[in-house]
Amino acid sequence: MIQMESLVQVADNTGARSAKMIGVIGKRTRQAHIGDIITCHIRESIPTASVKKGTVVKAVVVRTAAPIRRDDGSVLRFDGNAVVIIDKDNNPRGTRIFGPVARELREKKFMKIVSLAPEVL
């Protein structure tokens, strides 16, 4: 679970390093879970990035530090919060994904992100 004003890592190769969550798209709540689409403000990026510092982008949450309870009773939790920047068609803007992603992304129809990820937990 990520709430408003949370700092998150960017887990793709668009050049952005960290972002701040400023809203959840399609929900009235101020909290986002894995697979939710959020709006982010880029806080830090490298100079040659395709996404510059200060821009507002759409992103999907791929990892959260809050525990995720699965239907089989298992609990999954990551070390930090991470997002992948997406375009208007919900495809990732980068060509690589860094780190593992949760299996819940497959149920939410983010197949391109799941296929690019090195590991799906």
Curated annotation (Swiss-Prot):
PROSITE patterns, per database record: RIBOSOMAL_L14 (PS00049)
UniProt keyword list: Ribonucleoprotein, Ribosomal protein, RNA-binding, rRNA-binding
Q: Give the matching SMART domains.
A: Ribosomal_L14 (SM01374)
Q: Which CDD domains does the record associate with it?
A: Ribosomal_uL14
Q: Which GO terms describe its cellular component?
A: cytosolic large ribosomal subunit
- Molecular function GO terms recorded: large ribosomal subunit rRNA binding; structural constituent of ribosome
Specify whether Ribonucleoprotein is a keyword of the entry. Answer: yes
Would I find RNA-binding among this entry's keywords? yes
What does the entry give for GO biological process?
A: translation
Q: Which family does the UniProt entry place this protein in?
A: Belongs to the universal ribosomal protein uL14 family.
Q: What is the role of the protein in this entry? A: Binds to 23S rRNA. Forms part of two intersubunit bridges in the 70S ribosome.
SUBUNIT field:
Part of the 50S ribosomal subunit. Forms a cluster with proteins L3 and L19. In the 70S ribosome, L14 and L19 interact and together make contacts with the 16S rRNA in bridges B5 and B8.
Name of this protein? Large ribosomal subunit protein uL14
What is the species listed in this Swiss-Prot or TrEMBL entry?
A: Akkermansia muciniphila (strain ATCC BAA-835 / DSM 22959 / JCM 33894 / BCRC 81048 / CCUG 64013 / CIP 107961 / Muc)
Give the source lineage, highest ranks first.
Bacteria, Pseudomonadati, Verrucomicrobiota, Verrucomicrobiia, Verrucomicrobiales
Gene name in the database record: rplN
